[in-house]
Amino acid sequence: TGIQSVGQIAGVSTINIPGCPIHPDWVVGTIAQLLAGESPSLDEDGRPKAYFGKKIHDRCPRKEEDKAKTFGIEGQCLKEVGCKGPKTKADCYSRYWNSGTNWCIGANALCIGCTENGFPDKFSPFYDREDHDD
């Protein structure tokens, strides 16, 4: 399609802050670090490691629970019904949205991988079983 990133067009390095929606802390924290004269440590996708350094599944409170075979069962791991947490890096498990109210897994929904390269196309369909490495 000929689509290029800002970094490709401008020929400069960029810091990527993905998400749907992007958490305000990720933006403000990154800008504050830059204003303080510090460069955030970035991962291979150009994202700040402080926010995108660990897989959601590694810190998920449901990781060790029974694997759900269908939706609507409170507290079970949603990996078998399509949760993208095993492949998605973000600190959603500790950050929460709406002033600390909740996050996708806490709302009994699955992670849709919104902070990963290729979202949403690479992670569609959202509600489909996937094979994961762990």
Task: Mark where each language-model region is.
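Iron-sulfur-associated redox domains of electron-transfer enzymes in respiratory
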Residues: T1-K89
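Terminal, contiguous helix-loop blocks that mediate binding/assembly
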Residues: A50-D134
